[in-house]
Amino acid sequence: LTSVFGGAAEPPRGGNPDSNTLISDTTTVICLDDYHSLDRGVTALDPRANDFDLMYEQVKKPDFDAYIDPQKLDELIYVESHLSNLSTK
């Protein structure tokens, strides 16, 4: 990403130093984990498996209070039972 958008690659600030995600002062990475709309049957890389509309709405006009209080974000949350191999949205 930094080769496309510029800036010097560096590990995430305040994040996991072992992460392979590189950012710079001009580049950031948006994690799509909270936007997965499907839990089984397709890979998370399949566009059908993500709620890009929700991501777009939250990214285009950020509510900075939501970054301070994550409870204000509309997240898709899955509760998964590894024992029964069932999941609920």
Curated annotation (Swiss-Prot):
Region (Disordered): 1-22
A Pfam family that the UniProt record links to this protein: PRK
Gene Ontology cellular-component terms listed: chloroplast
Pathway in which the depicted protein is active: Carbohydrate biosynthesis; Calvin cycle
Entry EC no(s): 2.7.1.19
Protein activity control: Light regulated via thioredoxin by reversible oxidation/reduction of sulfhydryl/disulfide groups.
Catalytic activity: D-ribulose 5-phosphate + ATP = D-ribulose 1,5-bisphosphate + ADP + H(+)
Keywords, in A-Z order: ATP-binding, Calvin cycle, Chloroplast, Disulfide bond, Kinase, Nucleotide-binding, Photosynthesis, Plastid, Transferase
Name under which the protein is recorded: Phosphoribulokinase, chloroplastic
Source species: Vitis sp. (Grape)
